[in-house]
């Protein structure tokens, strides 16, 4: 097998949302994908322009008969063989599309996943195919009747949920794990931060966050490209409000 995405996890991916005839935040996703490929020393094909990228996404949606909302996944992998040292840095890609299932209407409860940790540092901000901690955290959440699990790094700092970035609200303070924690450099995370920084009277902090903060804050919400903004209802015995999440969701049209 010559696909290095299978043999070494030598691949990255992105997830995009198609809705109302458009791919949400397409430009931002494209720029992040190009940046991630450069970071992983993958050569970018000359035809991989923004226009060409959008055309491939739309072609995949059409081939799958998806005209309403859909989840798109773009997988990019290094081509050729080799072992840890690749024979080539050329890259190829695959595009998958599927219908977005209806959201569950049950209370959204989270719990810490402490069996394994995410590595801090900038490499973890890239969506590589090495997602084993996220997978095990998702299994843990399902087996224990939680809607999601919160991951930590080797410094025992909060990183994010298994599939999303994490925001905590305490009065006028907006707190989210910094990129150095190992959280994904999320597109919706960035949009939310941009919006909240324009709000008067609020202090926005990208910083190291202790798990103990989850029991001290007023509100918790998660962000990703498919969910948009997901309010968290409960963590252990702590119930949360959702006023900031509702405000940002309205302002960003999510």
Question: Where would I find each of the regions flagged by the language model?
Answer:
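Helix-start/capping segments and mature chain N-termini
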Residues: 1-59, 82-254
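Ordered, amphipathic secondary-structure segments that act as subunit-interaction surfaces
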Residues: 64-76
């Amino acid at each position: 097998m010559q696909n290095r995405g299978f043999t070494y996890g030598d691949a990255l991916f992105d997830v995009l949302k198609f809705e109302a005839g458009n791919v949400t935040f397409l430009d931002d996703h494209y720029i992040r994908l190009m940046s991630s490929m450069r970071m992983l020393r993958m050569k970018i094909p000359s035809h991989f322009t923004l226009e060409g990228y959008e055309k491939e996404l739309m072609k995949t949606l059409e081939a799958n008969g998806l005209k309403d909302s859909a989840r798109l996944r773009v997988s990019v992998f290094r081509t050729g063989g080799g072992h840890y040292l690749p024979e080539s840095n050329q890259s190829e890609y695959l595009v998958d599309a599927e219908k977005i299932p209806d959201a569950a209407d049950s209370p959204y409860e989270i719990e810490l996943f402490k069996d394994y940790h995410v590595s801090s540092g900038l490499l973890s901000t890239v969506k590589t195919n090495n997602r084993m901690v996220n997978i095990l955290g998702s299994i843990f959440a399902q087996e224990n009747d939680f809607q999601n699990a919160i991951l930590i790094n080797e410094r025992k700092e909060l990183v994010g949920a298994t599939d999303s970035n994490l925001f905590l609200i305490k009065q006028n303070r907006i707190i989210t794990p910094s990129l150095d924690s190992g959280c994904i450099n999320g597109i919706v995370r960035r949009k939310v931060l941009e919006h909240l920084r324009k709000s008067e009277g609020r202090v926005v902090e990208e910083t190291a966050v202790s798990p103990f903060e989850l029991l001290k804050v007023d509100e918790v919400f998660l962000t990703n490209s498919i969910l948009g903004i997901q309010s968290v209802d409960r963590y252990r015995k702590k119930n949360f409000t959702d006023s900031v999440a509702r405000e940002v969701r309205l302002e960003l049209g999510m």
